[in-house]
Structure formats: structure tokens, C-alpha cells
Amino acid sequence: MKNLLITIIVASYNSKDYILETLESCINQQYQNIEIIIVDDCSSDNSVELIKQWCKEKKSTSPKIRCILVESERNKGIPANLNNALPFINGDWIKCIGSDDILLPEAISEFVNRLEKCSNLDNIGAVFTYFQTFGYSVNVSTRYPSSWTRTICQMPPSWLKKAAAMIHFNN
């Protein structure tokens, strides 16, 4: 099971202030059998240029990790933007994150370790920590804002098996 390829899809839109930190958190995983697909939803800031430069640098420093950028021709919103990644996925499992999200270094290795104990799953939910940074201080919230309640119930942060994703999103 340790040979699973994990695809991390990063949904990006006008994310110049956060995207590099997000991408670094993806590539700095303890589990290294990953590919990173960034889907940009027609950003109007310089996000795309930053992403292209980052991918170019990582090709030389981390050549085993595939990193590609998929650019949308027009802004279509998050679901359609994520769907743009489907033709490029090679991984056995998919992790979708936003361009302002951070993966802890052990996130993928813990997932793969847990999957070894329960290998017949198609979807795995997860919890997350909501935080905001203001200068040098970090305020961590253990309670979800009430405006997120509906979103959390509908689509918790999760891992999705590639086969299940292809069946669900292509029908």
C-alpha cells in the first residue's frame, strides 16, 4: 500500500498572497509519492506567474514529483475548476485543497497509514483547523463560524478515491 500515488489538487483563484505557502506545504510532505495539480480559475492577479515559476523550480529540486498547472480560460467557479483537473490525475487517491490551505507535513503519510488498516473505502472525511494570521500572531479557532455550518455538512474536507471520482463526476 505504500506505493500509492496521491494526487493533490489545488484550486486557485487570485491567490498571490497564499499560493506559494500552500504549494510548499504540499511538496514538503513526509510521504513523497505525490503529484500536484494546480487548477487556476482565470486569476487576474499574478498567481499564474508565481505558480509557473514555482513549478519550474520544483522540476529541478524535486524531479520525482509531478507538478502541473491547468489554466481555465474563463472564471467558472470552484466545482468546474476542480473538474478541470480530472483528465490529468494519475493518483490512486485525490486530495482537494484551496489555495489558502496548508497541509501539515504528516497529512498524507497519516492518511496512507490509516488506509492500510481499512483499504476498501472510496471516500474518507477529515477534520481541519481554521486559523487566521494577523501579523506575527496566529489565532486558532476550534469552533466553526456559523456561516460555515452548511458548507461543512455538505462537503467536509475529504480524500476521494480516483475510481469513485471518475464515476461520480463523469456521469
Name these PLM-found stretches.
Residues 1-171:
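Nucleotide-sugar donor-binding/catalytic module of glycosyltransferases
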